[in-house]
Amino acid sequence: MEEDDDMAATMEEIVAHAKHRGFVFPGSEIYGGLANTWDYGPLGVELKNNIKRAWWKKFVQESPHNVGLDAAILMNPKTWEASGHLGNFNDPMVDCKQCKARHRADKLIEQALEEKGIEMVVDGLPLAKMEELIREYDIACPECGSRDFTNVRQFNLMFKTYQGVTESSANEIYLRPETAQGIFVNFKNVQRTMRKKLPFGIAQIGKSFRNEITPGNFTFRTREFEQMELEFFCKPGEELKWFDYWKQFCKEWLLSLGMNEEHIRLRDHTKEELSHYSNATTDIEYQFPFGWGELWGIASRTDYDLKQHMEHSGEDFHYLDQETNERYIPYCIEPSLGADRVTLAFMIDAYDEEELEDGTTRTVMHLHPALAPYKAAVLPLSKKLGDGARRIYEELAKHFMVDYDETGSIGKRYRRQDEIGTPFCITYDFESEQDGQVTVRDRDTMEQVRLPIGELKAFLDKKIAF
């Protein structure tokens, strides 16, 4: 999608703001960086952790069906043989012969067609068809403008390394490209030890690695990324009911944390897009400044994964239904959310530059209080009031992430907190010494109320709940 000036500026503003305020830094920056690697700064790690906690709260803690898991990143290579990743986990790649730039062929074509006003899903088309489209629409290299490309070929996305001291094929091992397989191989362990009856789910948050051909768009597409995945197992024949349930549940989770409904859409996969093992897949997409992009993939994976691992391992994954005495391989619904993508989406959704009545502009991040890095900032009106203000800070810090700032005018301190999304500023003034009350300022409305110091914890507890 071709960016207009406003969109490009908005993305540039987000990247600049993220670095300036300690949300995200370029990786290995003092050595010139490493392409498409990013480090979460002090505020970014708090925001991302809060998002992960919010996901775990709704998908595991409050769910009667689901339990958690933390599987190893390194797995027996037979896992990836069984799952099909070694043979089929590929992206179509094409090189520009002129400038040697490497492109993911389906995305190159889709972007070029979108600029011509044509919407087409190219993912999943045969390689020969992609070559035909490149010629038919006279597609040029975005880097140099040349139209001289290599043939489209498949490129395996797995990162390969070696375990042990010798680099031989017998010691080949892979960084996992998804967290899901660690769940599938542990299906029986979890079901037996937790005495779970169908339907039930296994949730996991963890790092995955894909040697993407064309990563980009800040933290949207990177080679190292974090996933929040649920594999929900159910009786065959009930999978589409649960598929619809999880689609709605995932959308409601985003909305409950303040995401603008106008910025998200549910897009069903076409028959051509569907993975061979799926009988239904829907993406929840977010309207980023660079176009619509996938946040969450909800897929009905049937019994493909458990069957594959049964066949390759010899382990029996049949489930015995005690009520009906039926024996079957469970079907699986997978809602898979990118932690980095959804963190970026919440940052973009929250970012605002407001024009105030006095003609000035303030930058503010309207993050849901549950997600905000700091829940409150304690601000003594004068450094002379530091002792009393610090006592409040120390008490609140036992329960929340709280900032303390005594530098600069109170107005400038308010603006600093607005820019990082702190929902409440607590000002300790000279009257506080006498009446035991403080002024609490709301980030979004900028309205102020006086509250007794002893009521601050209950006030914040109520405000950050979701």
From Swiss-Prot:
Pfam families: HGTP_anticodon (PF03129), tRNA-synt_2b (PF00587). It is found in: Cytoplasm. It is an enzyme of class 6 (ligase). InterPro entries: aa-tRNA-synt_IIb, aa-tRNA-synth_II, aa-tRNA-synth_II/BPL/LPL, Anticodon-bd, Anticodon-bd_dom_sf, Gly-tRNA_synthase/POLG2, Gly_tRNA_ligase_bac, GlyRS-like_core. CDD domains: GlyRS-like_core, GlyRS_anticodon. Keywords: Aminoacyl-tRNA synthetase, ATP-binding, Cytoplasm, Ligase, Nucleotide-binding, Protein biosynthesis. GO terms for biological process: glycyl-tRNA aminoacylation. GO terms for molecular function: ATP binding; catalytic activity, acting on a protein; glycine-tRNA ligase activity; protein dimerization activity; transferase activity. Its EC number is 6.1.1.14. It comes from the Bacteria. Disulfide bonds: none annotated. Catalyzes the attachment of glycine to tRNA(Gly). Belongs to the class-II aminoacyl-tRNA synthetase family. Homodimer. This is Glycine--tRNA ligase. The lineage of its organism: Bacteria, Bacillati, Bacillota, Bacilli, Bacillales.
